[in-house]
Swiss-Prot record:
PROSITE patterns: WD_REPEATS_1 (PS00678), WD_REPEATS_2 (PS50082), WD_REPEATS_REGION (PS50294)
Phylogenetic placement of the source organism: Eukaryota, Metazoa, Ecdysozoa, Arthropoda, Hexapoda
WD repeats: 445-486, 488-526, 570-612, 615-653, 656-695, 699-738, 754-784
Compositionally biased spans, kind Basic and acidic residues: 112-123, 138-148
Cellular compartments per GO CC: nucleoplasm; PeBoW complex; preribosome, large subunit precursor
Record's keyword annotation contains Repeat: yes
Protein name: Ribosome biogenesis protein BOP1 homolog
GO biological process: one example: maturation of 5.8S rRNA from tricistronic rRNA transcript (SSU-rRNA, 5.8S rRNA, LSU-rRNA)
Localization in the cell: Nucleus, Nucleolus; Nucleus, Nucleoplasm
Amino acid sequence: MTKKLALKRKGKESEPINKVVASSEASENEEEEEDLLQAVKDPGEDSTDDEGIDQEYHSDSSEELQFESDEEGNYLGRKQSSSAEEDEESSDEDDDGEEESSDEEEVEDEEKDSKLKQSDDKPSSSGAASKKAPTTELSKRDTSKPEYQDSDTSDEEDIRNTVGNIPMHWYDEYKHIGYDWDAKKIIKPPQGDQIDEFLRKIEDPDFWRTVKDPLTGQDVRLTDEDIALIKRIVSGRIPNKDHEEYEPWIEWFTSEVEKMPIKNVPDHKRSFLPSVSEKKRVSRMVHALKMGWMKTTEEVEREKQAKRGPKFYMLWETDTSREHMRRIHDPVSAPKRDLPGHAESYNPPPEYLFDAKETKEWLKLKDEPHKRKLHFMPQKFKSLREVPAYSRYLRERFLRCLDLYLCPRAKRVKLNIDAEYLIPKLPSPRDLQPFPTVESMVYRGHTDLVRSVSVEPKGEYLVSGSDDKTVKIWEIATGRCIRTIETDEVVRCVAWCPNPKLSIIAVATGNRLLLVNPKVGDKVLVKKTDDLLAEAPSQDVIESERIKTAVQWSNAEADEQEKGVRVVITHFKPIRQVTWHGRGDYLATVMPEGANRSALIHQLSKRRSQIPFSKSKGLIQFVLFHPVKPCFFVATQHNIRIYDLVKQELVKKLLTNSKWISGMSIHPKGDNLLVSTYDKKMLWFDLDLSTKPYQTMRLHRNAVRSVAFHLRYPLFASGSDDQAVIVSHGMVYNDLLQNPLIVPLKKLQTHEKRDEFGVLDVNWHPVQPWVFSTGADSTIRLYT
């Protein structure tokens, strides 16, 4: 059974499909498919054939064509027009001719049907697809099924990559391209170069229909349905091929204006007469207004204002009513006493009983009972009958009553703050390497306390001073003692000249300052140092009596000359500390007992001394030269003063808030100062920020004896009487808006304790991240 479908078409009649050769059609299809793939990969270019579209859909003439189709909607051929049939009938003379023409038409219909089926199996071009006639029947939806049962929405798509709608170029730097439903990384497939793409284009027959999925990075082969859909979109047609664009118009509502109304029911009588119920209601309201029962809106508002009263109140009146009501409705119960523990038992375990040391500490806190861990001393009895009466019972009950009666109660919200939130986040020590972590070498040779240590500027030799009245020079790499210089008194301090062109060691022993040539290293340098210290320069300036009585310069005697001593500077009081200026020509000494002449500055090239202060501002403990500026740091017991040596004035006074200062060290850039104190603290001062400590570090358990900055690395170390050397990271930034970064790194504890003394001095290697420490155990230890 066939159906006839009438279509109006513009343009000239195109050539029949059944006249196209199969081979040429296949080649044209392949060319069109390659052009289509290029259009998909490069959406900016339009590869549609405008001429073909115009020829197919827009022509000058229009005629009515008739086609034959079966029940499924497949084309069976074109039906000839009535005029052609009349011509054919007139041309046929007998019945035999009519039978032959009908047989030829059936053969042509069969051939045309077979070629159309072959063209349906292959991917057809846009022109071939446009010639397929739509079905005449309208598809009806099954009302028993849901409306969107057969359709896929965006929420139901099977999406492997769950990153969402984001730019995928964010994953260009990573090995993966996203995450699947199991939260596992989707690894990118291997990406080939241009040669691989060229070989794949030649060898892969499906290369033209392969596109890359941006979500997974994999190649996806387009199906025939996808190709057909893309062709329809590129050619500007409706994507759904089953959609009937020219379906018959169904006029659900008439377009003609009806003259007669749909309903012609007359209006009810009540629609134009006044309401009786409203009339009764209005009459009742009028009667209420006359009798004064009903009030207007203004009268109601006035009554409300009168009830509220005035809007002002007593400003200075004490509000006790709220607290009184709270006590009635929401009372705070009295805190309960703690339940008795094991220590309050009449027969407590032995670990709860006090030993002699704990008893002594408990009795020592008699004047400060609130600092005791327990308000009683645990006792042990054999039986409960032997327990005497508690003598403090009445007093404790009385104090409990006072607390309940006099102490106010209030509910406070307890803040649940995590302790880790309060701790500042510091970088890991592994990221701050290098720094010393292990003990590498122990220098043994002294027989008493080693009070001071100093390193040669090149980092090859080490000098140490001890209470055994000796100065020893060591080779750092081997630990061998090269030379020992004996002195008359205890060696308090040693300092190697920081100038690499000179080989001089300043040794403070008793009230004498010895300038020693160690005779190690370069021989030319040793000879140059001897020539410099051999002759005294001429004195053009007359020294005052105040300086002459405080210090005297002299050459060493013959026996001391053999030991290497070249110049002796005799002071009037014992010397505690000596320090060099960065250039190596000036050095300063400290005599705590010297009153207003406690600090002296000596010039080596002119053999001249100066007393910088005329008045005493306290007992001077330590002095330092600024590494860059002409400034002089003077530390007393409690404060630190900074003086300008050129202007001869006080620049700044640093407040340490400590009991006793033990030492100082200045950063190589000169903007930060590190101070050690005997009350277990280290103070970091930012000289550009404030006169108060930027940070106070309590890293040691006992007195901190010495601190030192490294000249090259952002490291500093501290030594204490708890036998520990703590190495810390101290980074100072060039940006003045960024605070210094201080991170404790390593605690090195290998020294032994002698007579309550531990580590006495620390010093850094000038080149390597190595630290030296001296202790009361007569040893020098190297940590690397």
